[in-house]
């Protein structure tokens, strides 16, 4: 099975390309979506995150408190790296299990931080999507319903 990564910065069109590939019949693993799911569903990961960031990082319904987490990690690269080091092994595990269930000769893995997480080491090829800064800004504004 050929494993191909899809990566690039925010607003470059990773999801657009991934959706096209899916429409063509190729399986696509969406790393960011899986990461968001498992931080609220995998009890092993929840325990590790609570150990590192405290019980208050989770709300009553086992949903992560994104505002609190953001205030901690996005002002401290060491804490962000620690969070990523906790989450990425679980995403790798999910990807490997997902691959075992695929019958396609080619699968794709979309990940915004493919290289930073060392995910590329488990892939045969990587496609890096790019776009101009202006295009990216316009896409993000449209996608998020924001204005400048």
Model region roles, listed by residue range:
Residues 12:
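ATP-binding Walker
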Residues 22-31, 43-44:
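Post-Walker A helix-loop "phosphate-sensing" segment adjacent to the P-loop in P-loop NTPases
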Residues 4-6:
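Hydrophobic anchor at the beta1->P-loop junction of P-loop NTPases
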Residues 33-103:
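ATP-dependent small-molecule kinase phosphotransfer cores
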Residues 9, 21:
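P-loop (Walker A) phosphate-binding loop of NTP-binding proteins
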Residues 15:
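Walker A/P-loop
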Residues 93-101, 107-139:
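ATP-dependent NMP and nucleoside kinases share a basic, alpha-helical "lid"
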Residues 1, 103-104:
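Short, high-confidence coil segments that cap the C-terminus of an alpha-helix
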């Amino acid at each position: 099975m050929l494993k191909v990564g899809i990566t690039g910065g925010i607003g470059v069109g990773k999801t657009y390309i991934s959706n096209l590939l899916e429409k063509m019949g190729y399986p696509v693993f969406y790393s960011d979506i899986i990461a968001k799911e498992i931080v609220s569903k995998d009890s092993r990961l929840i325990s590790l995150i609570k150990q590192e960031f405290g019980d208050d990082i989770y709300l009553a319904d086992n949903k992560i408190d994104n505002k609190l987490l953001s205030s901690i990690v996005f002002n401290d690269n060491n804490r962000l790296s620690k969070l990523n080091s906790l989450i990425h092994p679980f995403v790798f595990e999910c990807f490997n299990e997902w691959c075992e269930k695929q019958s396609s000769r080619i699968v794709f893995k979309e990940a915004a931080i493919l290289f930073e997480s060392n995910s590329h080491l488990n892939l045969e090829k990587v496609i890096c999507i790019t776009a101009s800064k202006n295009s990216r800004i316009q896409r993000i504004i449209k996608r998020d319903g924001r204005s400048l």
